[in-house]
Swiss-Prot record:
Protein name: Small ribosomal subunit protein bS16
Superkingdom of the organism of origin: Bacteria
Source organism: Francisella philomiragia subsp. philomiragia (strain ATCC 25017 / CCUG 19701 / FSC 153 / O#319-036)
Pfam families named in the record: Ribosomal_S16 (PF00886)
The keyword Ribonucleoprotein is annotated on this UniProt entry: yes
Amino acid sequence: MVVIRMARGGAKKRPFYRIVVADKRSPRDGRFIEKLGFFNPLAKGGEERLKLDVAKAEAWLAKGAQPSDRVASLIKEAKKVA
């Protein structure tokens, strides 16, 4: 099954997430099919908190990809902004 989930990056205590499409069996931070954007939970000032290609996300959802709970809420948030 194909899922849309977050892959963690960044330093210790400073998380930064890439929003990726991956096979469910792949490791969290491992192999992925396509990168859709990023999420920075610790963004301050002028830094961008969320960048997501909504069109690509919609295309993957139409193909049957299942978003994680957090990614589903981020997609909804990105649609409001766009």
